[in-house]
Regions:
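Nucleotide/pyrophosphate-binding catalytic subdomain
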Residues: 1-277, 282-283, 289, 297-311
Length: 311
């Protein structure tokens, strides 16, 4: 590839700027969660995996957790299986759990592994069922709606424990786990778990340096319909205020809960970035300005410089 001198200078400046972060994060663990939306777009998928490949080759221990909601809905409709979501969470009956396994463990996981092979990432596809990675129980019916309707989520699980043994063995051997959020109870009954929830639990169990949530939005927005209202950083109290004010709703609700769980579980920093940006992850991790939203336990722990431009 021929590079003009101006481009060479720009690339060198970028490397120099990123060098402190590369040194800082070498050997650290990042959990990256990508929703099914990214996998509906081959170019977005490639861009995401290319960025993860760079992290991997820089020595970051990456665990990739993927969703598959749009693909699951599409296949369910094609098979005549009805879809219902409550507060951003899918109700999963017996037919739906079969479709879920087909999409998550079969379609999405395998496609990601194929992309990893193309980009020279040694990756291994697993689910929460494998080696008892995610142990869960079937969620009891709960009242969530405004009218007090009792909601039975069906074959949806709530996490009991995360056993990171298999993840650590893979990471210690230079392999990148690609995790489907499917789990099972102690009797082996398959359970669907929100991918944000699984990513947060894995991040906490690994005491990850970062949890990175890749979404269709540029980050957390002050105004849901205005992408220019990006919030550069906030903390748990700020997140709570946004939820109380109704500025976090629908599909962002599980993400907000996952962010809180991850930080309270020991993850230092959570980032919400856009998968639609070709440099969403790298720009967030390796620049002072960032590209999305940083969430920490308490913004007062950030330095003034960090509060102006946060890596």
């Amino acid at each position: 590839m021929i590079m003009h001198r101006s481009d060479q200078a720009l690339a060198i400046r970028a490397l120099r700027s990123a060098a402190p972060y590369i040194r800082m994060y070498k050997g650290k663990t990042f959990v990256v969660k990508a929703g099914g939306g990214v996998f509906a777009d081959p170019q977005a998928t490639r861009s995401l995996v290319e960025q993860i490949a760079i992290l991997h080759h820089f020595g970051v221990r990456v665990v990739l957790v993927h969703g598959g909601g749009p693909q699951l809905t599409e296949l369910a409709e094609a098979l005549g299986v009805p879809t219902r979501l409550v507060d951003g969470r899918r109700i999963t009956d017996q037919r739906s759990i079969d479709v879920t396994a087909m999409v998550l463990n079969g379609l999405i996981n395998t496609r990601v592994l194929g992309m990893c092979r193309d980009l020279n990432i040694e990756a291994v596809g697993i689910s929460g069922v494998d080696a008892g990675l995610v142990r869960a129980h079937k969620r009891a019916p709960v009242r969530l709606t405004a009218d007090g309707e009792l909601i039975d989520f069906g074959f949806v699980g709530d996490i009991d424990t995360v056993d990171t043994t298999v993840l650590r063995k893979l990471l210690d051997n230079g392999l990148m786990p690609v995790v489907s959020p499917l789990s099972a109870d102690e009797s082996g009954t398959l359970l669907n778990i929100n991918a944000d929830t699984v990513a947060a639990a894995i991040g906490a169990a690994l005491q990850a340096e970062k949890l990175i949530l890749c979404t269709g939005a540029p980050g957390i927005l002050g105004s849901i319909d205005d992408p220019r209202s990006l919030i550069s950083y906030t903390d748990l109290n700020g997140l709570k205020r946004l939820r109380e004010e109704g500025r976090i709703a629908a599909g962002m609700l599980p993400k907000a809960k996952a962010i809180e769980d991850a930080i309270r579980g020991g993850v230092r920093r959570v980032h919400v970035v856009s998968y639609q940006s070709a440099e969403g992850i790298l720009g967030e991790v390796f620049t002072n300005e960032g590209t999305g939203t940083l969430i920490v336990a308490d913004v007062n722990a950030l330095t003034p410089a960090e509060q102006q431009s946060t890596p």
